[in-house]
A protein has these predicted regions:
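Basic, polyanion-binding surface patches
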Residues: 1-142
Length: 142
């Protein structure tokens, strides 16, 4: 939430597991993004997993910031972060660090807790500037 109490959100095209002990994730964001200034160390965020049924939410959070939360139901999670119950799951995390690289930044977050709301239908993947679902499993990693 902003200091004025407005919710903040954006679509991260890549969220990556960074470590398991402690549990860490990372994401990248353009420094010119309207959400960037709010991703300071100590800030709480909700990272939602998306599937084919929630593609609309990825598109909504990538739209103009004035429209991101219009006509969308969400609950107030820890530290008042927006949590969307329509998604398969959510990870609550705290920003550990922010490293600026050229006009972008790498955000490292500590995973605090997670919640599952339902089973994902078809996981959503962002690839070559478009949304896709996963295809056939090619090989197990033994």
């Amino acid at each position: 939430m902003t200091e004025a109490g407005e919710p903040i959100g954006f679509t991260a095209s890549s969220v990556t597991s960074l470590g398991s002990n402690p549990p860490l994730v990372s994401l990248n964001i353009a420094q010119g993004s309207s959400s960037y200034q709010h991703l300071c160390p100590g800030a709480t965020v909700a990272i939602h997993t998306l599937d084919a049924d929630t593609l609309w939410l990825a598109e909504k959070m990538a739209a103009d910031k004035a429209q991101r939360f219009s006509d969308v139901e969400f609950e107030s999670g820890p530290d008042s972060v927006p949590v969307f119950g329509q998604v398969p799951s959510v990870l609550i995390a705290k920003v550990r660090s922010r490293t600026e690289v050229e006009s972008n930044a790498v955000i490292v977050l500590d995973a605090v807790r997670s919640a599952s709301f339902r089973t994902a239908t078809e996981p959503l993947v962002y690839f070559q500037r478009g949304y896709h679902t996963l295809g056939a499993r090619l090989k197990d990693n033994n």
